[in-house]
Amino acid sequence: MPSSALLYCLIFLAGVAASIKSENSCIHFPTSLPHMLRELRAAFGPVKSFFQTKDQMGDLLLTGSLLEDFKGYLGCQALSEMIQFYLEDVMPKAESDGEDIKEHVNSLGEKLKTLRLRLRRCHQFLPCENKSKAVEEVKSAFSKLQERGVYKAMGEFDIFINYIEAYMTMKMRKN
């Protein structure tokens, strides 16, 4: 019996340590965010001109209304939905443009997943439930563009990074 009590005690302490570590990583998140955004921009760099050259459309997919949602009360949900949109709808299609492109898009996706994970761990940055109308408009326009939508969305990925930065800067000022 004493050995099982010791085991339970160790498990409990490990959980407490993990919780403290998670909280500490949130304390440092605001200082690590610029580095994470630089990594996203650097990962996008090798494919940026490829996708922007393929995007022959003049209108933006990521409009000012999306940025306003990022800055408004729907910011959390807009950010969460847009990360999911890029990871599930855009990037899998973008990977079909050749092995070299696939490698870079995959790397970009991994960095975006890491950002999403860090945001979810630090609930003050991503505590949301509501739907964003602007994100729905982006998704609808993307669908209407069919295969051209991938070039449009990937070509504007740098705008998406800027919107993430605007949202996170606003959230850090409030906290």
Swiss-Prot record:
Q: Which PANTHER family match?
A: INTERLEUKIN-10, INTERLEUKIN-19-RELATED
Subcellular location field:
Secreted
Which organism is this entry from?
Sus scrofa
Give a GO biological-process term.
negative regulation of type II interferon production
User: What does it do?
Assistant: Major immune regulatory cytokine that acts on many cells of the immune system where it has profound anti-inflammatory functions, limiting excessive tissue disruption caused by inflammation. Mechanistically, IL10 binds to its heterotetrameric receptor comprising IL10RA and IL10RB leading to JAK1 and STAT2-mediated phosphorylation of STAT3. In turn, STAT3 translocates to the nucleus where it drives expression of anti-inflammatory mediators.
> What is one cellular component GO term in this UniProt entry?
extracellular space
Q: Which gene encodes it?
A: IL10
Swiss-Prot/TrEMBL keywords: Cytokine, Disulfide bond, Glycoprotein, Secreted, Signal
Quote the protein name from its UniProt record.
Answer: Interleukin-10
